[in-house]
């Protein structure tokens, strides 16, 4: 038996958030009660004061950089870091070297993930080599375990390719995740075209670059019925566009990075 005491117990599935004790017996949650109500009976006791007790967290957008860029991270170290942060399931992006656009590379990632203490899933790329010119074999890669499709970090500019990807993904019921920045509107990526641009005297990326592609792709997503994930959204206008689209379809989703929802350009 394991008794976890004095933690903040959070379970989004039932909207629970309260301080209390949690008893685990035979690998299952046996009881949740206010602090001090569960008596210690000889098992392991963990004092979780100041900590959160929650189901395993899921991160649908991670970079373990394996294969090809393991000087930054690899599947083993990434999984260990995820576990330390409470994440028990992760979805890897496909922008590795080689790109996860074929069965062999996808199998390498998934097999290596099986030897970690967490659940490791992986996306495949939407286009071959992340070039945005030719679709991967989505049906094959999905059948071999791809959790979704993304050219993360590179926007899909060819509308014909995008529509083909959406139609195919919708037919097999798998999500497509998109990096939304129109490069035609950007003079220097990674810096907002406002305070930071003026402060450092460099070009920047205007909010319109994100808004433009989000609006385009939401329209196509609603027409095709695809499950769409708008990646690392960073503007209030983008959020509002997603909110409006979700009123028409629950297949529309968005994600944000910690720095996008916790910092503004004034922090530069």
Where are the model-predicted features located?
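A glycine-rich helix N-cap at a beta->alpha junction
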Residues: 111-126
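Histidine/acidic residue-rich metal-binding segments in metalloenzymes
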Residues: 134-268
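Active-site metal-binding motif and surrounding structural segment of the metallo-beta-lactamase
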Residues: 37-53
């Amino acid at each position: 038996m394991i008794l976890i005491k004095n933690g903040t117990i959070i379970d989004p599935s039932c909207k629970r958030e309260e301080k209390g004790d949690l008893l685990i017996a035979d690998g299952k949650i046996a009881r949740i009660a206010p602090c001090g109500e569960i008596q210690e009976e000889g098992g392991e006791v963990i004092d979780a004061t100041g900590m959160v007790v929650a189901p395993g967290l899921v991160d649908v957008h991670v970079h373990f950089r394996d294969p090809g860029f393991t000087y930054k991270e690899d599947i083993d170290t990434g999984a260990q870091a995820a576990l330390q942060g409470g994440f028990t399931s992760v979805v890897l992006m496909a922008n590795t070297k080689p790109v996860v656009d074929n069965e062999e590379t996808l199998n390498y990632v998934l097999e290596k993930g099986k030897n970690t203490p967490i659940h490791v899933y992986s996306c495949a790329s939407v286009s071959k080599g992340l070039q945005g010119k030719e679709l991967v074999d989505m049906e094959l890669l999905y059948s071999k375990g791809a959790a979704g499709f993304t050219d993360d970090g590179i926007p899909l500019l060819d509308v014909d390719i995008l529509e083909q990807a959406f139609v195919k993904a919708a037919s097999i019921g798998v999500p497509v995740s998109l990096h939304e920045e129109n490069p035609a509107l950007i003079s220097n990526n990674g810096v907002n075209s406002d305070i930071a641009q003026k402060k450092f005297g460099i070009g920047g990326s205007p909010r319109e670059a994100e808004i433009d592609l989000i609006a385009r792709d939401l329209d196509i997503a609603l027409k095709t019925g695809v499950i769409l994930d708008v990646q690392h959204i960073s503007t209030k206008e983008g959020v509002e566009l997603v909110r409006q689209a979700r009123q028409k379809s629950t297949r529309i989703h968005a994600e944000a990075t910690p720095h996008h929802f916790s910092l503004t350009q004034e922090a530069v």
